[in-house]
Swiss-Prot record:
FAD binds at residues 11-16. Homodimer. Heterotetramer of two MnmE and two MnmG subunits. Belongs to the MnmG family. HAMAP family: MnmG_GidA. Gene3D superfamilies: FAD/NAD(P)-binding domain (3.50.50.60), GidA associated domain, C-terminal subdomain (1.10.150.570), tRNA uridine 5-carboxymethylaminomethyl modification enzyme MnmG/GidA (1.10.10.1800). This is tRNA uridine 5-carboxymethylaminomethyl modification enzyme MnmG. The gene is mnmG.
């Protein structure tokens, strides 16, 4: 029997689900292969979505027609907007999610997406013919043929879990690892290595003394990750709880370090710098007497809690003893211990910006296989890989995002141009155009691109136009409406603001950092009437978007001009068959890096570590500039 598809997606994690859903929505016949259909989009670590820079990625995924934002909104049990005390370029949405409902919501999407089919199995190897992928062969011996394959294998390629001295093969607790794909691709010349990540114990909430913790509730107004107006039932909101380790806890952990895989030589791989294990914390920060932890609820009604900040691969008995040294956890019962896991990843400089591999045509990688960490980073890559897998099948060009267009663009460019030597996670500091990549306007930046390829439906387009019309109407009004001191000063003085000495435009008044649009509405009835025309469910979002554009107009224009200047280098393409090793005028390091990465444009070459401005000038001469 022959089974033929346009796109095969291997793995149904966050990257795989976005890839499969996007390709299917665009019209490809898609097969999603997973060893467990009951664990689609499993939240393998903490039950949360978003956070600093990650929340922006989720909004970008939604603006492009992806599903992570919609699923998060439907399953959120707490919402917070982080960094509100800073400028809007730093605002980052974050939500606690009901883990089980999150998987159920994704399963519902996958099952009801036309053109998307599932197969429960694992993949043994790829079918590759004449340098191009042709399908996969599963552990059951079934061969599926396809014009493109997207690998989103997470931590399952060669996965080995560490529970103290005990080592168990697996990609997740109680789930087997995959073998065969890494070995096959290595034989084809792919560069591969190992990385490590970890997860903490899960705790029974009935054994926690919450009176000895600090409650952290969410925000009362129910924000959304999605720009869509999809109806939803708001789940019962749950709090998180803060607590701290102490010297007694640290002493117990220290005595067990000789049994820690991280310190006895058992683990050789590099773990995530910004999510260190508790063992790493007490060694690296030996002078600190306490480290903050957070108890995060796993669901709307669940007693299970995730202990954020206590990732560990120490033996169970040491983990348990150390936890019981914390007053709130004196009588703790755990559902399962923390553990570390090592897995295979592939050097992402072997990818193009479409996430297609350079050595094998039609083969795409997304997620942890590229050396990243995080649900959001994986989902963003999956979406781009799924779009491009579809376009590749139908000879319809390619879809990429620039560093000035999306955090997803920054993420992929960093991977492709710089590579990774540790698990990569996104931060706002990685983006040079943060003011252009705000979470409030991802729809303005990206939904037109989704419309152009057919990924945005008509309702999404309607909502974008509505937002644009009302936002521009508000801004236009502020440019035209003049304020007289005798009318506005009583309001300003009663609110503690400096009075006006002469008449000014409303726009100029709003440039004052301490004065907001909502406050001005109470002073200017005609502005209030425009605000009241906006649908109530979107009023706060649209007013906020207009206010940000007014207050940060100068900064936005300056950053846009800088981005446009750099983008001119993006249009200068490098010849792909030049022998850089023969270009003696380039530095030795530049020759090596350019040969290995083979950048597509001058701009990409300029971002490669080791390629100097002098090297870039030589490349410009090569391109006839």
């Amino acid at each position: 029997m022959q089974f033929n598809y346009d796109v095969i997606v291997v793995g149904a994690g966050h990257a795989g689900c976005e890839a499969a859903a996007a390709a299917a929505k665009l019209g490809s016949q898609v097969l999603l292969i997973t060893p467990d259909m009951n664990k689609i989009a499993q939240m393998s670590c903490n039950p949360a979505v978003g956070g600093i820079a990650k929340g922006q990625i989720v909004r970008e995924i939604d603006a492009l027609g992806g599903r992570m934002g919609i699923v998060t909104d439907a399953t959120a049990i707490q919402f917070r907007m982080l960094n509100r005390s800073k400028g809007p370029a730093m605002w980052s949405p974050r939500a606690q999610s009901d883990r089980m409902r999150f998987m159920e919501a994704w399963r519902d999407i996958v099952e009801h997406e036309p053109n998307l089919y599932m197969w429960q199995d694992s993949v043994r190897c790829l079918s590759i013919r004449q340098g191009a992928v042709a399908g996969v062969v599963t552990a059951l011996g079934v061969e599926f043929q396809a014009r493109t394959v997207v690998l989103t294998t997470g931590t399952f390629l060669g996965g080995v879990m560490h529970f103290g001295e005990r080592m168990i093969e697996g990609g997740r607790i109680a789930e087997p690892a995959f073998h065969g794909i890494t070995e096959q691709l290595r034989d084809l010349g792919f560069r591969t290595d190992r990385m490590k990540t970890g997860t903490p114990a899960r705790i029974d909430g009935r054994s926690i003394d919450f009176s000895l913790t600090t409650e952290q509730s969410g925000e009362e107004d129910h924000h959304r990750f999605s720009y869509m107006d999809t109806p939803r039932r708001v789940l019962r909101q749950r709090s998180c709880y803060a607590l701290y380790t102490n010297p007694e806890c640290h002493e117990i952990l220290s005595k067990g370090l000789d049994r820690s895989p991280l310190y006895n030589g058992q683990i050789q791989s590099i773990g995530p710098r910004y999510c260190p294990s508790i063992e790493t914390k007490i060694v690296t920060f030996a002078d600190k007497e306490m480290h903050q932890l957070f108890l995060e609820p796993e669901g709307e009604t669940s007693n299970e809690f995730y202990l954020n900040g206590f990732s560990s691969s120490l033996p169970l008995e040491i983990q348990l003893e150390a936890l019981k040294a914390i007053p709130a956890l004196r009588h703790v019962h755990i559902y399962r211990p923390g553990y570390a896991i090592e897995y295979d990843f592939f050097d992402p400089t072997q990818l193009r910006h479409t996430l297609e591999t350079k050595p094998v045509k039609g083969l795409f990688f997304a997620g942890q296989i590229n050396g990243t960490t995080g649900y959001e980073e994986a989902a963003g890559q999956g979406l781009i890989a799924g779009i491009n897998a579809h376009l590749h099948c139908h000879g319809a060009g390619e879809f990429t995002l620039g560093r000035d267009e999306a955090y997803i663009g920054v993420l992929i460019d960093d991977l492709v141009s710089k590579g990774v030597d540790e698990p990569y996670r996104m931060f706002t500091s990685r983006a040079e155009y943060r003011i252009l990549l705000r979470q409030d306007d991802a729809d303005m930046r990206l939904t037109p691109k989704a419309e152009a390829i057919g990924l945005a439906d008509s309702r999404r387009s309607e909502l974008l136009r509505e937002k644009q019309v009302f936002r521009d109407k508000l801004i236009d009004f502020t440019h035209k409406f003049s304020l007289k001191p005798d009318l506005i000063n009583p309001h300003l003085e009663s609110a503690g603001h400096l009075p006006l000495k002469q008449g000014i435009k409303l726009y100029d008044l709003l440039l004052r950092p301490q004065i907001g649009m909502n406050e001005v509405c109470s002073m200017v009835p005609s502005l209030q009437r425009i605000v009241e025309e906006i649908p109530a469910s979107r009023r706060e979002e649209i007013v906020e978007a207009a206010e940000i554009l007014i207050k940060y107009d100068g900064y936005i224009k300056r950053e846009r001009a800088l981005a446009d200047k750099i983008n001119r280098l993006e249009s200068i393409r490098l010849p792909q068959h030049v022998d850089y090793m023969q270009m003696q005028s380039l530095s030795t390091e530049a020759r090596q890096k350019l040969t290995s990465i083979r950048p597509e444009t001058i701009a990409q070459a300029s971002r490669i570590p080791g390629v100097s401005p002098h090297d870039v000038s030589i490349l410009l001469v090569l391109c006839g500039r």
